[in-house]
């Protein structure tokens, strides 16, 4: 049976090997022959020693590589070992205590005979920073205490300042007295000095072309009111932008005129006049060229073809309009004829129903009269001709 892991086992529960070829090393030998166990032991020992030595060599190489990498990295990223100083943090000062009140209390507690105003000379701090606190307006919220930080160049000066501040009592405007808590900060942040060298781009803005165009455009905006009401970029020359806008407006106007003439057809007469003028000028030029040149040049018949096509299109349009007019006139004539026919039928019906009178019999039928009059024609003869 196969195990869950997919390994085959014997009936005894031992794992099966890959086959007889791997684990039966005495195959092909007689049973009487014996194998020296020392030879096999020596082989095994040599193999283990070799693997152990190889693993040691790899570990040593890794260590060397790490040390070399760390050495290079430290050399590249190494910082200057300057004395950053020491910072004394004074905490748990009264909440409403201000910086002026804090230094006033320090001056009052100065018992030296010297000037009380020169407290920095006594404490010997290089820099200071004060953070003012406040009382909380909510009942269940703690008030924030004020604090002060001093920077010193030496630890001895820091210790003297700390011993002096321990003797002081700080009071705020609400008569709350607190004893401050002082600690040495492990992290000191100092602002690095700015480089005295000027940057490469300092003083080159006046030579920049974009800056020049900007200044010129600002002057033009102040001088001309036309530019102020248009959306032009200030970083480009306003004169060019204005000329471009005028060209665009002219092109748009021409295109709108073309579209309107195509839709409405009002500009046909103007076009025909212009074309006639062009044709006349072309004919004059052609005649002058013929007179100047000895060899006559053939003229292309492009204009004639275009004219013929246009005439055909105009004729078809006029024909269509005439057909419509004729149809309407024919309809009106047919209506009049129908009315006459109806009137004649009504007269016939009325005459058949009534007895015919003598006057009606004597009257001839309604017929159109023929032209009985002979036209008068005069024959004229010339005097020269013989009669």
From Swiss-Prot:
Localisation per UniProt entry: Nucleus
Biased composition (Basic residues): 15-29, 55-71, 272-285, 295-307
Cellular component annotations (GO), alphabetically ordered: cytoplasm; nucleolus; nucleus
Entry keyword NADP: no
Low complexity composition bias: residue spans: 350-368
Region of interest called Disordered, as start-end residue ranges on this chain: 1-71, 270-317, 345-387
GO biological process, one term: nuclear-transcribed mRNA catabolic process, nonsense-mediated decay
Amino acid composition bias (Basic and acidic residues), ranges on this chain: 30-42
Keyword line: Nonsense-mediated mRNA decay, Nucleus
SUPFAM superfamilies: RNA-binding domain, RBD
Gene3D superfamilies given in the database record: 3.30.70.330
Placement of sequence motif Nuclear localization signal: 15-31, 58-75, 284-300
Function, in words: Involved in nonsense-mediated decay of mRNAs containing premature stop codons.
Other comments on record: Present with 1250 molecules/cell in log phase SD medium.
Family: Belongs to the RENT3 family.
UniProt name for this protein: Nonsense-mediated mRNA decay protein 3
Source species: Saccharomyces cerevisiae (strain ATCC 204508 / S288c)
